[in-house]
Amino acid sequence: MTDVPAVRIRNFCIIAHIDHGKSTLADRLLQATGTVDERQMKEQFLDNMDLERERGITIKLQAARMNYQAKDGQQYVLNLIDTPGHVDFSYEVSRSLAACEGALLVVDASQGVEAQTLANVYLALEHNLEIIPVLNKIDLPGAEPDRVVGEIEEIIGLDCSGAILASAKEGIGINEILEAVVERVPPPPNTVDQRLRALIFDSYYDIYRGVIVYFRVMDGTVKKGDRVYLMASEKEYEIDELGVLSPTQKPVNELHAGEVGYFGAAIKAVADARVGDTITLCNAKATEALPGYTEANPMVFCGMFPIDADQFEDLREALEKLRLNDAALQYEPETSSAMGFGFRCGFLGLLHMEIVQERLEREYDLDLIITAPSVVYKVITTKGEELYIDNPSHLPAPNDRERIEEPYVKVEMITPETYVGTLMELSQNRRGIFKDMKYLTQGRTTLTYEIPLAEVVTDFFDQMKSRSRGYASMEYHLIGYRENPLVKLDIMINGDPVDSLAMIVHRDKAYGMGRSMAEKLKELIPRHQFKVPIQASIGSKVIASEHIPALRKDVLAKCYGGDISRKKKLLQKQAKGKKRMKSVGTVDVPQEAFMAVLRLDQS
């Protein structure tokens, strides 16, 4: 099965914005080449996580090997590597691009180029991939292929004379796409006789076989039974299972340069088989590793605590298993006076955080409390030390810090010009600095802003979508740290600070934020037998306060008329009890209160 010469192998991926039809196109290619028969076919075949199907997005990378008889009569092997399209998952995209020589750029013929498509195209150009433009959904009544071709040529600078018009849903243009892949995507270089170097582009954990690694052989040959060495983690393993993904796993005995496959080697932890690592042979090690791998740095942090303290170990185990599949997830144990034991987790963005939370709850049956997301702040102390703080409760006291710097991102939005005003207003409300505005083609504009990441991670994306009725798209990347007058906003309930509700905010926004948090918590915290004060403070200065009135039992219900002193005695006894209760009683803060903090409308 693997005796195909490198000249007849094509490795390609599909780049597209969310909802431009990438997974459907992948389904059609699998059907057209007979890789999956009609009986097994289901929508979004390569999206094999329930969550992916439900949300209609691709999260984990998939790969599929297709055999294709081209018009020139030759038999070709096409390796399709599926890529996610959401802004949070750009690290997964860069790994899959490194394993390819070509890319299909899928653009919705009715919507045109979107911001995320642009970001991925630039990544593909950095990897020197041959890009084939495909205009999808041309069967829609609103499709305007000529306008979109103009957009691609103008915005990306690609020659679209060979653009393919297709409709994955109707199966139009599928054969043209396959032919274009054969003709235009360059074959992998024939480096079979060099020392083995292979790139890991994905891995997942199988409870029976350990970690299964997806890889692309760059140079040399790998055989079943070989002892391999992973260059970054410096571990050795023996390959006990080797195969290709077609798209289900089929064992083979060896794979040559240019081929894509998987192997199992009883690897216990995914941390030992890091994505982007280079595989080589123990007895003939490559001199240098493959270039281009960078550690994925989390941008957003939050605390995760099990509602039931007994589930702490289960949560640790679940996070370890998710980390297996998700190189970008980071976590470390933390304790909170309000919530007990839990973990501080780092994510690439908000969608990534939601997905991890949902997978923990769905796949591992955990009930979690998630604290408000925060970003990594840089604190310069009075002694001149640089500290990186991802948890507001670790912030040094005001007297010990010289200044606080926060991360800024460059946000590029592509939007119909009708919504430019409202998006500019949103960006300015989020402390954005206007940088640039370009008119692309008729009716579409790009806006460029520099905005603090803390303002983007809460609900900027949702706000942008709702203000533009879903038409605008955005892409962001980190541009560095800048100093701002930031303060730590503490929330005190019944006189005790709740560390999980603390946040770092801009001084100008602190009052409004404190007021709305106090009001929100007043609605959400259930009434207790005693009066509960809620205060928002900066340092020792209280800037907003509310209180929840006590529930009181009518102790006079059984007194009919009679002497006032009897009633007074009962009321004083009740007051004394309330006083004692207030000093020892604890206030339960429900999960909704933490979620409400996430959704505080800042716009």
Swiss-Prot record:
Catalyzed chemical reaction(s): GTP + H2O = GDP + phosphate + H(+)
Listed Pfam families: EFG_C, GTP_EFTU, GTP_EFTU_D2, LepA_C
Swiss-Prot/TrEMBL GO biological process terms: positive regulation of translation; translation
A molecular-function term among this protein's GO annotations: GTP binding
A Gene Ontology cellular-component term: plasma membrane
Family statement: Belongs to the TRAFAC class translation factor GTPase superfamily. Classic translation factor GTPase family. LepA subfamily.
PANTHER family: TRANSLATION FACTOR GUF1 HOMOLOG, CHLOROPLASTIC, TRANSLATION FACTOR GUF1-RELATED
Record protein name field: Elongation factor 4
Organism, scientific name: Nostoc sp. (strain PCC 7120 / SAG 25.82 / UTEX 2576)
